[in-house]
Swiss-Prot record:
It holds the Pfam family TGT. Belongs to the queuine tRNA-ribosyltransferase family. This is Queuine tRNA-ribosyltransferase. SUPFAM superfamilies: tRNA-guanine transglycosylase (SSF51713). The active site is at residues 99, 275. Transmembrane segments: none annotated. Keywords: Glycosyltransferase, Metal-binding, Queuosine biosynthesis, Transferase, tRNA processing, Zinc. GO terms for molecular function: metal ion binding; tRNA-guanosine(34) queuine transglycosylase activity. Pathway: tRNA modification; tRNA-queuosine biosynthesis. Its EC number is 2.4.2.29. Catalyzes the base-exchange of a guanine (G) residue with the queuine precursor 7-aminomethyl-7-deazaguanine (PreQ1) at position 34 (anticodon wobble position) in tRNAs with GU(N) anticodons (tRNA-Asp, -Asn, -His and -Tyr). Catalysis occurs through a double-displacement mechanism. The nucleophile active site attacks the C1' of nucleotide 34 to detach the guanine base from the RNA, forming a covalent enzyme-RNA intermediate. The proton acceptor active site deprotonates the incoming PreQ1, allowing a nucleophilic attack on the C1' of the ribose to form the product.
């Protein structure tokens, strides 16, 4: 099946296959093609920490994520505009998704004030007063020339009462309408615009948020407000019902998630796109994802271990260095430890999603899931019930 998402958008989405709820798809964007399910490395400040652009290409990343909030504050729009956009500034010629800055603004807590017009906050860099609104967020992301633009929304905190979550999502819906109007009608931006579903842990509010976004109409839909401190059982509960209600012909993006197991479970429930800082952050702390689970390289048992980090991995780190060497680098506090670890962890995530795509193409996704958990010594969680 093939769909043109929106006559005003240059993005196309094609669903290539399905196993249960799991989907194999393809996104065509202004800067290239993205095969889904996909994991997007996070490049908050215009760089994936510890990685050269050529390293990101070598791990076979298809698309990366940038942060509107941080890039707006530093280096600022003028510098990026002088370079002709974020792609040229950071020397990355493949697709980029930028979040709107909403999550970062609302994580400032008492440092920000929310009004209907937008949010006023103190810059965490120099303390100056900054105002961010749906319209300004759209203008920033146009200067960045993001292939996928995210709407400016309020990320519902956890925990939140039903009343608090409803008030928050209704503000986000009003902002979503303003985002679309400004993106399409004022800016004439043909890059993709995604809506973000909020509503906390309440199914009726998630429905209200989704239905409101559908009335406005977006090129894709993201699930926000998860991985914000809720128990995993709560996250799975939302994923059990929400993706199945989202449009079949548009990409589904789970924001900020997460662990390899979370990605597998979300794919089983119909999600297509993921991002998370976990692989890079864990690498800087000596925690490496491997086929059989997790290696904490600072453990003294690796001091004489001459095996590669993961014998199943084809990354630069695993093809050239032993666990003993990585242990040595960590104990010495060498910068190279986090660099080699980041290369490996991000390649692991790319191999994971590539394996999922291959299994979906070959009709062996159930076997893939069983093998994934068996290698970790874990029981296979129940499949979602349709």
């Amino acid at each position: 099946m093939f769909f043109r998402l929106d006559l005003e958008s240059c993005m196309k989405f094609e669903k290539l296959g399905q196993s249960g709820r799991a989907r194999r798809g393809r996104l065509t964007l202004a800067h290239g093609v993205v095969e889904t399910p996909v994991f997007m490395p996070v490049g908050t400040y215009g760089t994936v920490k510890g990685m050269l652009p050529r390293d990101i290409e070598e791990i076979q990343a298809q698309i990366i994520l940038g942060n509107t909030f941080h890039l707006y504050l530093r280096p600022g729009l003028e510098v990026i505009k002088e370079h002709g956009g974020l792609h040229e500034f950071i020397k990355w010629d493949k697709p980029i998704l930028t979040d709107s800055g909403g999550f970062q603004v609302f994580s400032l807590g008492a440092m920000r004030k929310i009004k209907e017009e937008g949010v006023t906050f103190r810059s965490p860099i120099d303390g100056s007063k900054v105002f961010l609104s749906p319209e300004i967020s759209m203008e920033i992301q146009q200067v960045l020339n993001s292939d996928i633009v995210m709407i400016f929304d309020e990320c519902t905190p956890y925990p939140a009462t039903h009343e608090e979550a409803q008030k928050s999502l209704q503000l986000s819906l009003r902002w979503a309408k303003r985002c679309k109007t400004h993106h399409h009608e004022q800016l004439n931006n043909t890059n993709a615009l995604f809506g973000i579903i909020q509503g906390g842990m309440y199914e009726d509010l998630r429905d209200e948020s989704l239905n409101g976004l559908l009335e406005i109409g977006f090129d894709g839909y993201a699930i926000g407000g998860l991985s914000v401190g809720e128990p995993k059982e709560e996250m799975i509960k939302v994923l059990d019902y929400l993706p199945a209600k989202m449009p079949e012909d548009k990409p589904r993006y789970l924001m900020g998630v997460g662990k390899p197991e979370d990605i597998v479970e979300a794919v089983r429930r119909g999600v297509d796109m993921f991002d998370c800082v976990m692989p890079t952050r864990n690498a800087r702390n000596g925690h490496y994802f491997v086929t059989d689970g997790l290696v904490r390289i600072r453990n003294s048992k690796y001091r004489h271990d001459q095996s590669p980090l993961d014998p199943h991995c084809d990354c630069y780190t695993c093809k050239n260095f032993t666990r003993a060497y990585l242990y040595h680098l960590e104990k010495c506090g060498e910068m190279l430890a986090s660099m080699l670890g980041t290369i490996h962890n991000l390649r692991y995530y790319q191999r994971l999603t590539q394996g999922i795509r291959d299994a979906l193409e070959q009709g062996t996704f159930d076997e893939f899931v069983t093998d994934f958990y068996t290698r970790r010594g874990l029981d296979v969680p129940p499949a979602p019930v349709d």
